Amino acid sequence: TTESHMEQLILKHFTEEDFRRVWMRKIGGGVIGGKACGLLVARKLIELNMPEYAGHVEPHNSFFIGTDVFYRYLVYNRCAELKARHRLEKEHFKETEELTKRLRGGSLPEDIREELSDMLDHYGTTPIIVRSSSIMEDGYGNAFSGKYESIFCMNQGTKEERMEELEEAIRRVYASTMNEQAIEYRRKRHLLDVDEQMALL
């Protein structure tokens, strides 16, 4: 995380084993974002402070796709320069439209696709949800509730069909950083100058 309050909670309560478990489930570099950190911290606080309820919490079975994958996706699909100009020009509509188009039509680097394929092997044909977990999301004072997409994947059919469904879900979540609600929320919170980075949960 890059959020100081969240960082303090994590450093105070997490063990070396907790960090290792996240690392084992992480795809790509960078941080895992606000929503993922919030989820992990909430689970840890229940475990430490309300052990009588810990047994009722479902076992953690999520993977984390780091913010560096989003950055690489931008570069790989010729979006990085456009995104930088878009931010400098205070999220101008023309750049928003073009950037959304490129994000929705992009492709992932092959090494990331290989790791995603391994992740699908882990889940088998169990349905999954690709959830946004941006740097700003669910941080102190900036909830971003419902501003970015979460995509349900049936995860059925051939391996190729399941991979395509997963990649399309990732593209949609990445593109949701450009939706009108998210931009307006950033504008109201005076966050247009902040480089929003998207991790996935």
Pin down the residues of each PLM region.
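Nucleotide/phosphate-binding sheet-loop regions of phosphoryl- and nucleotidyl-transfer enzymes
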Residues: 1-201
